[in-house]
Regions:
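An N-terminally biased module of ancient metal coordination in phosphate/nucleic-acid-related enzymes
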Residues: 1-28
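Active-site gating/metal-coordination segments in enzymes
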Residues: 22-109, 115, 157-163, 170
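Short, electropositive alpha-helical surface patch
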Residues: 24-40, 123-127, 176-185
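Glycine-centered tight turns that cap/initiate beta-strands
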Residues: 38, 65, 122, 152-155, ...
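H/E-rich (His + Asp/Glu) clusters that bind or coordinate divalent metals
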Residues: 134-136, 140-206
Length: 206
């Protein structure tokens, strides 16, 4: 399904990011990547608290297309999950393996994410979906303050993605522009990744 869209939009390389919190999903998308020339990277999932997580990371990273992992933080009930000491060994291992950490978070996670990013200064961290600010309600001030603090750290990148998916189909350009402008002011082009959020995007847009 993606192939024709890639060609039509003159996109030459893509990264697949996991959509389910299972290692089986990571194996599945790594297999797709092996067979698909334009897929240049995969961001998968592991259970960072599993006693065998390091061996799992070792196995998955035998495929050089594995670039990092994304825990589904926005679905984890414990808002302080990322600060747990039980994660330290596995996160230090990500650094050792040269892998990244995608932070799928909401605005209420950002203060903890700042503490987390300072705790692991050598871990490359990507904030997904600009941290999902509540754009329809115009909630920008606290989000902007927290994102500004994060942008001051060298190990933080921001993924420009998922914006219209979060708003829904009844959105206007005027709603989005203030957030877009702030992100580009904070991170500039060098630390911004564009993500299509495809196929989830097709729920609201082409």
């Amino acid at each position: 399904d993606l192939g024709p869209l890639i060609k039509e939009n003159k996109i030459t390389e893509t990264v697949i990011v996991q959509a389910a919190d299972t290692v089986a999903e990571t194996d599945f998308i790594l297999d797709i990547a092996r067979q698909t020339p334009y897929v240049k990277g995969v961001v998968g999932w592991v259970d960072f608290e599993d006693s065998n997580v390091k061996s799992c990371i070792d196995r998955l990273s035998q495929n050089p297309l594995l670039k990092g992992f994304r825990p589904m933080i926005h679905d984890i009930k414990d808002v302080n999950w990322m600060l747990k000491d039980t994660l330290t060994e596995s996160l230090d291992y990500l650094v050792k393996k040269g892998l990244s950490f995608d932070a799928l978070v909401r605005p209420n996670h950002l203060k903890n994410l700042l503490v987390f990013a300072k705790k692991y200064p050598d871990l490359p961290i990507v904030i997904d979906h600009i941290a999902k600010p509540v754009i329809p309600k115009g909630e920008i001030d606290e989000w902007l303050k927290d994102m500004s603090a994060l942008a001051s750290l060298d190990n933080i990148w921001c993924k420009f993605s998922g914006i219209v998916t979060e708003i829904g189909e009844n959105y206007t350009k005027g709603q989005i522009v203030p957030y877009v402008e702030r992100i580009f002011e904070l991170f500039e082009s060098q630390r911004i990744m564009w993500g299509s959020d495809w196929p989830v995007l097709t729920m609201v847009e082409s």
